C-alpha cells in the first residue's frame, strides 16, 4: 500500500468559550476574497495561509484584523533582489544553525522589530517554526488596512473578546489554524500520527511493515514536489527489489525522530519538517546506491 493522501486536508479548528453568530470558516474553505467585500473580517493565525488571507481580504473588506497568540517572524518574498528560496539555496552549504542565524539577521534588518507594527515579539529562535513568507502584511499593517490583535478570549454573538480586554464585532472569522496528520482509512490502534512522533525512515518506509509506504509525508522548507518525486523513484526501486530495506531500519527511524534536521517546536507540522537540501541529498544517495 502506498499512502499519498497528504497532510493539508483535515482542518484543525480552534476552540474558544462562547458562540460566534457570524460566519466561521477554516482556511481550507477559503477560495477568494470577493465574498468578504464590505464585511468585517477577523483572521486567526500567523502562518503563510493566515497572512495571505489577511492581505487578500483587506483589499475588499470594510475591516480586517489579524489575531496572533504568539509572535512570528515575517520573511520577505525577496531578499537582495532574489526570491527567498533562491537566496536560501545559495546558503545551503552552511550548517542549518548558521543559515538560520544569517537569515534571521537579514529579516530583522529588513523588517525591524515586530513591536513597530503592533505585533507580539517572537517567542522562539529563528528556525524553530516554519517561516512565514509575506511581503505585503507589514505594509498593510502600517497603512492601517490590517489591524493586529492579540489572542482571542471568547465569543458573544458577533462580538469577539480578546485577552487584552478589548472587543470588536466581526461578520466573518477565518481560522488559519493548520491541519491534522490524518489517515482515516487506518484503524487508530494500527497507525495514528495525529499526535506524537512519525517514525518513518526517510519519511516513507514503515519500520515494521515492508509493504506499507508513504509519499509526501513531510514538510520541507521549500517545494514538496521534488522531494515526493525522489521518494517515488526510491519506492519504484524498492518495489522492484533493487533497493533493499536496511536491516536496522527500526533504529534508523528512531534516530530520525530523536535527531531531526531542525530543532523545532513540538507540533504536528513541525514533527515532519525536513531541511529541503539535506532531504533531497539523502534520497538521491539511496537511489544512487541502489542503481
Predicted regions and their residues:
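Basic, ligand-binding patches in group-transfer machinery
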Residues: 88-89
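Charge-dense, low-complexity polyampholytic segments
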Residues: 249-253
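Long, charge-rich alpha-helical interaction segments
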Residues: 254-258
Amino acid at each position: 500500500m502506498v499512502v499519498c493522501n497528504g497532510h493539508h486536508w483535515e482542518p484543525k479548528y480552534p476552540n474558544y468559550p462562547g458562540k460566534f453568530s457570524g460566519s466561521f470558516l477554516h482556511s481550507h474553505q477559503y477560495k477568494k476574497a470577493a465574498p468578504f467585500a464590505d464585511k468585517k473580517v477577523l483572521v486567526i493565525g500567523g502562518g503563510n495561509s493566515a497572512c495571505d488571507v489577511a492581505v487578500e481580504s483587506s483589499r475588499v473588506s470594510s475591516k480586517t484584523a489579524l489575531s496572533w497568540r504568539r509572535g512570528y517572524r515575517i520573511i520577505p518574498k525577496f531578499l537582495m533582489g532574489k526570491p527567498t528560496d533562491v537566496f536560501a539555496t545559495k546558503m545551503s552549504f552552511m550548517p542549518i544553525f548558521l543559515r538560520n542565524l544569517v537569515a534571521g539577521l537579514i529579516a530583522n534588518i529588513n523588517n525591524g522589530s515586530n513591536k513597530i507594527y503592533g505585533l507580539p515579539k517572537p517567542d522562539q529562535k529563528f528556525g524553530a517554526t516554519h517561516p512565514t513568507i509575506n511581503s505585503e502584511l507589514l505594509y498593510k499593517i502600517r497603512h492601517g488596512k490590517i489591524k493586529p490583535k492579540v489572542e482571542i478570549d471568547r465569543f458573544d454573538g458577533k462580538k469577539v473578546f480578546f485577552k487584552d480586554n478589548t472587543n470588536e464585532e466581526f461578520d466573518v472569522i477565518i481560522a488559519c489554524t493548520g491541519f491534522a496528520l490524518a489517515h482515516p482509512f487506518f484503524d487508530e490502534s494500527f497507525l495514528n500520527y495525529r499526535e506524537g512522533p512519525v517514525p518513518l525512515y526517510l519519511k516513507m518506509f514503515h519500520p515494521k511493515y515492508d509493504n506499507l509506504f508513504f509519499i509526501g509525508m513531510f514538510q520541507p522548507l521549500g517545494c514538496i514536489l521534488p522531494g515526493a518525486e525522489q521518494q517515488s523513484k526510491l519506492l519504484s526501486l524498492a518495489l522492484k527489489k533493487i533497493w533493499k530495506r536496511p536491516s536496522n531500519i527500526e533504529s534508523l527511524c528512531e534516530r530520525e525522530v530523536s535527531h531531526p534536521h531542525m530543532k523545532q517546536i513540538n507540533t504536528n507540522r513541525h514533527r515532519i519538517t525536513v531541511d529541503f537540501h539535506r532531504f533531497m541529498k539523502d534520497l538521491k544517495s539511496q537511489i544512487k546506491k541502489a542503481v
